[in-house]
């Protein structure tokens, strides 16, 4: 299958030209995004990423208005579980699950009863989505067999949507996952096309894009997002937002680098909180109708400022722990949503 690749850059439009007055930029974004429902182009996103601190509150407020108008008030809650941890043959430089780095993560498999119990616990939080993740380049026959068995067992026992994240897929694998009832498939672009070779060398950005296109064509929902703080420039963050806008995923998870010991990016600094909030606002203004999910690294990046992201465009969260790092307790996130008077999306609303 030939991948339809997004352009590396999008020509800037006049209203978002470099050096534009911040107030004029936000007025333009209000007209284009809030009122007309058209996401900002690459130049507009870059301008938001460059906003001075004194305009950050206005950008977050506008992004929240956009989220409320085009997505509604509800927040989607998801839990994730690692079916196969560690020993991955790929060299994603931020990931402690790569077998190429001297990280403390060791290879392990989870059995099907444990998957079902994790799905039950996730559903008990009010979550509507449960994602089965495997640290692989792509699924082999053994993994596909485990996934078939696990998805069937979860669907028989728990009232929750099942998603998967199993790496790059063949068309036959896409068709099989669709047939067994996988609701959504996660496959992140991670970073922009121009920066990707500095983050991963064992496969290409284009290979990831092709899997995403196959998933969309098969009728599964597509979850495709980013990890910020992996050495990319602001221009490359804007490039990624524009590429995601071309792909039109149903969901974009925003991860922030949580530096892992033993990985090439293990000594990178976390994204600064204000830069993270600018990115949240910018991605919402680029993707007005998309589920924008708080994902890994938000705790170390934002700390006590997480609620500002929820009031700046975020409308979904992963609760509990991540794959190899600790998250906040589910109760803490649910309390945050309650304190912000943000209702949790019901299962029926996701179908």
Curated annotation (Swiss-Prot):
* Cofactor details (free text): Binds 1 [4Fe-4S] cluster. The cluster is coordinated with 3 cysteines and an exchangeable S-adenosyl-L-methionine.
Give the EC number(s) under which this enzyme is classified.
2.8.1.6
Going by the UniProt record, its keywords in alphabetical order are: 2Fe-2S, 4Fe-4S, Biotin biosynthesis, Iron, Iron-sulfur, Metal-binding, S-adenosyl-L-methionine, Transferase
The record's listing under HAMAP family reads:
BioB (MF_01694)
Enzyme class, UniProt record, top EC level: transferase
What's the subunit arrangement here?
Homodimer.
What family classification does the UniProt entry report for this protein?
Answer: Belongs to the radical SAM superfamily. Biotin synthase family.
MF-aspect GO terms: 2 iron, 2 sulfur cluster binding; 4 iron, 4 sulfur cluster binding; biotin synthase activity; iron ion binding
Q: Where is the Radical SAM core domain?
A: 73-298
The entry marks the following residues as binding [2Fe-2S] cluster, namely 131, 164, 223, 293
PANTHER family, alphabetically?
BIOTIN SYNTHASE, BIOTIN SYNTHASE, MITOCHONDRIAL
- BP-aspect Gene Ontology terms: biotin biosynthetic process
| TM spans (from-to) | none
Query: Function of this protein?
Result: Catalyzes the conversion of dethiobiotin (DTB) to biotin by the insertion of a sulfur atom into dethiobiotin via a radical-based mechanism.
Q: Which cofactor does it need?
A: [4Fe-4S] cluster; [2Fe-2S] cluster
Pathway assignment reads: Cofactor biosynthesis; biotin biosynthesis; biotin from 7,8-diaminononanoate: step 2/2
Binding-site residues for [4Fe-4S] cluster, renumbered to this chain: 88, 92, 95
| Gene name in the database record | bioB
Task: Enumerate the PROSITE patterns for this protein.
Answer: RADICAL_SAM
Official protein name in the record:
Biotin synthase
Catalytic reactions of this protein: (4R,5S)-dethiobiotin + (sulfur carrier)-SH + 2 reduced [2Fe-2S]-[ferredoxin] + 2 S-adenosyl-L-methionine = (sulfur carrier)-H + biotin + 2 5'-deoxyadenosine + 2 L-methionine + 2 oxidized [2Fe-2S]-[ferredoxin]
User: Which CDD domains does the annotation name?
Assistant: Radical_SAM (cd01335)
